[in-house]
């Protein structure tokens, strides 16, 4: 096997692993939301057979399809993009993860909360840089 064939096989295996991971994640989110596959297909505008193939890891959905599925499941499209390998994961934060995965709030509300949180963390970081001897930010 040539080096090009080995590389192609490795890329193909990685792509199928990603497809399987995103599929199982979508399935778990769907089951957590108590939504049938048919209901999710209907809500997201994706055919039932295609959604089934995605969940089983046989097809890797496009960013548009992931966005539609995310909206139908009321989860962040960013989470699905990262799982699918479309986006690189951003800085780890328990608060950020909690906001993104919360199904009780809308995508718009999630984005507003994330923006506010980012603003506070950047402000606190700037304060720490100005006063490195003070380990905790002040309450202004």
UniProtKB/Swiss-Prot annotation:
Q: Name one GO biological process term.
A: regulation of DNA-templated transcription
What are the GO cellular component annotations? cytosol; peptidoglycan-based cell wall
**Entries under SUPFAM superfamilies matching the protein:** lambda repressor-like DNA-binding domains
What residue intervals traverse the membrane?
none
Residue ranges of the DNA-binding region?
Answer: 37-56
**Alphabetized UniProt keyword annotations:** DNA-binding, Transcription, Transcription regulation
Q: Where is the HTH cro/C1-type domain?
A: 26-80
Pfam families (UniProt xref):
HTH_3
Report the leader peptide range.
none
Q: Please name the SMART domains in this protein's record.
A: HTH_XRE
Residue ranges annotated as coiled coil are: none
Q: Does the keyword DNA-binding apply?
A: yes
Any other noteworthy remark?
Answer: Was identified as a high-confidence drug target.
What is the name listed in the Swiss-Prot or TrEMBL entry for this protein? Uncharacterized HTH-type transcriptional regulator Rv0474
Which lineage do the record's taxonomy fields give for this organism? Bacteria, Bacillati, Actinomycetota, Actinomycetes, Mycobacteriales
């Amino acid at each position: 096997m040539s080096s090009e064939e080995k590389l192609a096989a490795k890329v193909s295996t990685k792509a199928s692993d990603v497809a399987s991971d995103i599929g199982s994640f979508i399935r778990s989110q769907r089951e957590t939301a108590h939504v049938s596959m048919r209901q999710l297909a209907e809500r997201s505008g994706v055919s039932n057979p295609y959604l089934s193939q995605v969940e089983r890891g046989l097809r890797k959905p496009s960013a548009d399809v992931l966005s539609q599925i995310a909206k139908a499941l009321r989860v962040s499209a960013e989470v699905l993009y990262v799982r699918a390998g479309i986006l690189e994961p951003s800085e780890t934060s328990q608060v950020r993860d909690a906001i993104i995965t919360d199904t009780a709030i809308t995508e718009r509300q999630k984005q507003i909360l994330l923006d506010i949180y980012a603003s506070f963390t950047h402000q606190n970081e700037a304060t720490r840089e100005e006063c490195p001897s003070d380990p905790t930010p002040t309450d202004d």
